Design a protein with these regions (language model features):
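A generic structural motif
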Residues: 1, 32, 88-91, 107, ...
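Acidic, metal/ion-coordinating pockets
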Residues: 1-177
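Short secondary-structure transition/capping segments
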Residues: 16-18, 143-153, 180-195, 319-329
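Binuclear metal-dependent phosphoesterase catalytic core
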Residues: 29, 33-56, 153-243
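Non-catalytic terminal accessory segments
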Residues: 189-559
Length: 559
């Protein structure tokens, strides 16, 4: 189980009452408990541990499912620290329940690196089983990572959002050899590793049934409805805030003013400041058709917009700056003492940053061994500034581009495609496909704002402060900090129109991304993609022949 199932009691209760009975002892929640409404008994949501025998080699596996010490669950949810869990009588008894265990498997929603919960579990198992292999499957921080806790224990974390399929394998239980791969999740890679000639040969009757069912559900929920044609790519992390290609720039300068401000005609004549937490945005928006499905991918949270009317400008204008100084609010459960706990974004961003800068700095300065850089006034490492300056020069100076062709990219065959580039602490190559790292910019604020238009001419002018409901308590706290003449409470807060963070893009797309001939525009984009070497794949069920025919030059088949 992960932290996202635990913020809301109705979700956790649904897991307990419907999901767990279906999966039985295969659903493991070793340290997560629930007290159902109207009861006083705390019980595990799922099973604490299980034992099973593998089909082919008849190995006996003992498995647990562990969550990090998450403290922001709904009332009635308790998560025990793994360091305390391993001291429990039931856990110690489980380690001694049988003398026949070939390997331990721990499915843990916990970071592989930088979290001592794994070490506590490892030490507890080793106190009873000193050499039995332990396979640990981590998560939560969205990165590709691997760590060997000893010669018989590997921990693997496999990215996020099903972008990565993590493959951990072990041979020879007595003297184990571990290996791992981070496989980009797409049918072509699946076919390659299955030894198939073409991805279409993955098609099976059951798979076609599942696909048809999913297509029917998508149609029933109108997920394929096209709201508009996005004219360009907008990036969540690749471009600095303020750049026209940055998603947060699009949001603050265009979407919030055009969609949110206009959603409440009753206050149309009032000057307003709109504030939103950037963490509500989860992915890039790419050029092309923008569908209802894309809306859920990019902005999945349904936060309403609230407002406090008639706030002095000398108070309102300080809010966004101070919010960014304080950092992102990740959950506002009453009584929370660790507001950032449960948030994976900072570690994931650090992973992207390290991959991007390390890759290019190694190519620019292969003799450089410095791993630390003194900060510059902007707060960015000097190496990052130097890299950005070089990349900019290469883009504008033809002679530099010729001297440093590996920095130019963009032409097929000269540079690997963009993707994850991983450096973990396990031996050997982890990434299954060679990539150029995805560009990354540190300059992303935790909070963004659409300023009043025009800006107030005096500090004593008044504005409506509009904000996503997720940050209501933070806004009220700061209003009370900066306005000594007034005490703000939730009684001063009202709902602003009918816009939600989930509906922002669909509304904006219908205002600005609609074309007279949508079908013609989509057809032209398909033709352009085909011309660039990326034709649409044929349907899976159109391929004939033996799916297990010998594979010759398989990687070439997939290009």
């Amino acid at each position: 189980i992960g932290n996202h199932e635990l913020y809301n009691m109705s979700v956790a209760q649904d897991v307990y009452e419907h999901f767990v009975p279906h999966w039985g002892d295969r659903y493991l929640t070793s340290n997560v408990h629930i007290t159902l409404p109207g009861t006083t008994q705390s019980r595990p949501i799922g099973h604490r541990y299980t034992r099973f025998t593998t089909k082919n080699q008849r190995l006996t596996i003992q498995a647990y499912g562990v969550l990090f010490d998450f403290q922001l669950g709904a009332p009635g949810i308790t998560v025990q620290d793994p360091k305390a869990m391993v001291k429990e009588a039931w856990f110690q008894a489980s380690l001694r329940a049988s003398s026949d265990v070939d390997a331990f498997v721990i499915a843990g929603h916990m970071p592989v690196t930088g979290y001592d919960g794994w070490d506590a579990i490892h030490e507890a198992i080793r106190s009873v089983w000193p050499t039995t292999p332990i396979l640990m499957l981590g998560g939560h921080t969205h990165v590709r990572d691997c760590r060997m806790l000893d010669s018989h224990a590997m921990a693997l974390e496999s990215g996020r959002y099903l972008e990565t399929v993590g493959w951990m394998s072990m041979s020879n239980v007595s003297v184990p050899t571990f290996s791992r791969r981070y496989i980009d999740a797409n049918p072509r890679n699946y076919a390659f590793h299955a030894g198939l000639v073409h991805a279409g040969h993955l098609s099976t009757p059951r798979g076609r049934f599942v696909r048809a069912t999913m297509d029917a559900m998508a149609r029933a929920w109108n997920l394929t409805d096209v709201y508009g044609i996005v004219p360009r790519d907008y990036y969540l992390d690749r471009a600095p805030y303020g750049d026209p290609s940055a998603l947060l720039t699009l949001m603050s300068e265009h979407i919030l003013p055009d969609v949110v401000r206009s959603s409440f005609p009753a206050r149309a004549n009032a000057s307003s400041l709109i504030i939103m937490n950037s963490g509500s945005q989860r992915f890039d928006v790419f050029a092309g058709a923008f569908t209802k499905n894309d809306q859920y991918i990019v902005s999945p949270f349904r936060d309403a917009f609230l407002f406090v009317p008639d706030v002095p400008w000398y108070v309102a204008r300080r809010l966004v700056h101070r919010l960014n100084e304080l950092g992102a609010v990740h959950n506002e459960q009453p009584g929370a003492v660790h507001p950032a706990q449960g948030d994976a974004d900072p570690i994931f961003h650090q992973y992207l940053r390290h991959a991007f800068y390390s890759y290019w700095l190694n190519r620019l300065s292969p003799t450089s061994t410095s791993s630390t850089q003194s900060p510059v006034p902007s707060g960015r490492p000097a190496s990052a500034r130097r890299l950005e300056e070089l990349l900019e020069q290469v883009g504008t100076d033809g002679s530099m581009a010729e001297a440093l062709p590996h920095l130019v990219g963009g032409s097929r065959g000269r540079s690997p495609s963009l993707g994850y580039v991983t450096a973990d602490s396990c031996s050997g190559l982890g990434d299954d496909t060679v990539h150029t790292p995805i560009p990354y910019s540190d300059e992303q604020p935790d909070y963004i704002a659409a300023q009043p238009v025009p800006l107030p001419s005096s500090d004593h002018d008044h504005v409506d402060v509009i904000f996503a409901d997720f940050i209501a308590q933070s806004i009220l706290s700061l209003l009370n900090t900066y306005d000594a003449r007034r005490h703000y409470t939730m009684a001063d807060v009202s709902v602003w129109g009918n816009a939600t963070t989930e509906s922002l893009y669909s509304s904006f797309a219908q205002l600005h991304w609609r074309l007279d001939s949508m079908d013609s525009a989509l057809h032209d984009m398909d033709r352009a993609a085909t011309f660039d070497g990326y034709p649409p794949l044929a349907p899976f069920d159109t391929y004939a022949g033996d799916p297990y025919a010998p594979v010759t030059a398989p990687r070439l088949v997939f290009q």
